Amino acid sequence: PLVSRAWVVSQGASWGDTSKPGMAQLLQDVQKYAPDQQPDGFFEFGYTEAKVTQAIIAKAISNNDLSRDGLFNAFESLKNVDLGGLLPPLNYGSSPDERVPSRDNTVYAIDPTQPTSVRDLSGDFTGSAAQASKF
């Protein structure tokens, strides 16, 4: 069938891939706080975004400034935010040149036997077109 030849290009660790420390932590947190949560890529995305928000708040606390401006300054100062392999490390900054998005991708095959119905074929990689792009 056609679905056996379909690929999806996205980002992120495969649900259940505990070789990624971030996924191992996500699964522990799901077991502890939301044991009925079904495997879901959108849940994983939200969890990852919460980790970024946590990094912003932690930086603002270390700067002793939880004001709106303090949170924004904390965001602009974040570099190499490690998400434990859920996504590649993220960089933020105060200028477009510093806010270069991740260029990594993962190719997945449709696989209904997997928790989120996709199977990682490639691991994180950056294609030549993405490497050459300028922002």
Please state what every model-predicted region is.
Residues P1-Y47, I61, D124:
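Extracellular/periplasmic periplasmic-binding protein-like sensory domains
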Residues D36-F43, Q54-S117:
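Segments of small-molecule ligand-sensing domains
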Residues A50:
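C-terminal helical cap and adjacent loop that interface with cofactors, partners, or active-site loops
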Residues L121-F135:
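Short, cationic low-complexity segments
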